[in-house]
Amino acid sequence: MSTLSVVIKDITPEQVAIISQGLVAGVDEVGRGPLIGDVVTAAVILDPNKPIVGLNDSKKLSEKRRNALYQQIMDNALSVSVGRASPAEIDELNILHATMLAMQRAVAGLSILPERVLVDGNRVPDFGIASHAIIKGDGLVAAISAASIIAKVTRDAEMDTLDSQYPQYGFAKHKGYPTKAHFEALALYGVLPDHRKSFKPVADRILLQNTF
């Protein structure tokens, strides 16, 4: 963690207002838990002159509402950037370090240099600028909520694309997470190139494939 970063727990509305002033980038990730695909992160700098009503943790929003807010964010934010780490990078680095790398890529891709970066969770990669990790920040800080929506809609769309290529795996429904349906598909159809081979259910299936 950078010496410029701070972890904030139990943040007050007053603190949110203070640290949200100026050019602030909110950052969040989606896809740490799935067995397949990229971990996707987003960085968003909102326009204070164009407030977006209804921003919240993407997991608490319906798909229809997320998609509507996604378009509003894309149309009204000062800058939006998506960063990702591939399954190969996840296998090489581990999911935590790959997520930190993806966050760095998202911030680096912004068209405007933020004065401060606010990240959901309790860890912050080194952005080289002042940054704060805010526990449950995706439900508290508008810029982080916006980032969570961008990341979620982006990754879900990628899972829908994967579903069209491999409909027997059911990716459109479980989004690659370790559900019963996903385990059954792994057992029946095997491991795909985009599966994270360092994740135990996938590694176990590879071992079984190589045994017979």
Swiss-Prot record:
State the Gene Ontology terms under molecular function: manganese ion binding; RNA binding; RNA-DNA hybrid ribonuclease activity
SUPFAM superfamilies listed in its UniProt record: Ribonuclease H-like
Cofactor binding notes: Manganese or magnesium. Binds 1 divalent metal ion per monomer in the absence of substrate. May bind a second metal ion after substrate binding.
Where, by residue number, does a divalent metal cation bind?
Answer: 28-29, 120
**Pfam short name (any one):** RNase_HII
Name its co-factor(s). Mn(2+); Mg(2+)
Q: Where in the cell is it found?
A: Cytoplasm
Q: Locate the RNase H type-2 domain: which residues?
A: 22-211
The keyword Metal-binding is annotated on this UniProt entry: yes
Q: Which UniProt keywords apply?
A: Cytoplasm, Endonuclease, Hydrolase, Manganese, Metal-binding, Nuclease
EC number assigned by the record? 3.1.26.4
| Domain of life of the source | Bacteria
Cross-referenced Gene3D superfamilies, in alphabetical order?
Ribonuclease H-like superfamily/Ribonuclease H
Cross-referenced InterPro entries: RNase_HII (IPR022898), RNase_HII/HIII (IPR001352), RNase_HII/HIII_dom (IPR024567), RNaseH-like_sf (IPR012337), RNaseH_sf (IPR036397)
* Catalyzed reactions per annotation: Endonucleolytic cleavage to 5'-phosphomonoester
Task: Name one process (GO BP) from the record.
Answer: mismatch repair
A GO CC term? cytoplasm
Q: Any idea what job this protein has?
A: Endonuclease that specifically degrades the RNA of RNA-DNA hybrids.
The family classification in the record reads: Belongs to the RNase HII family.
* This protein's name: Ribonuclease HII
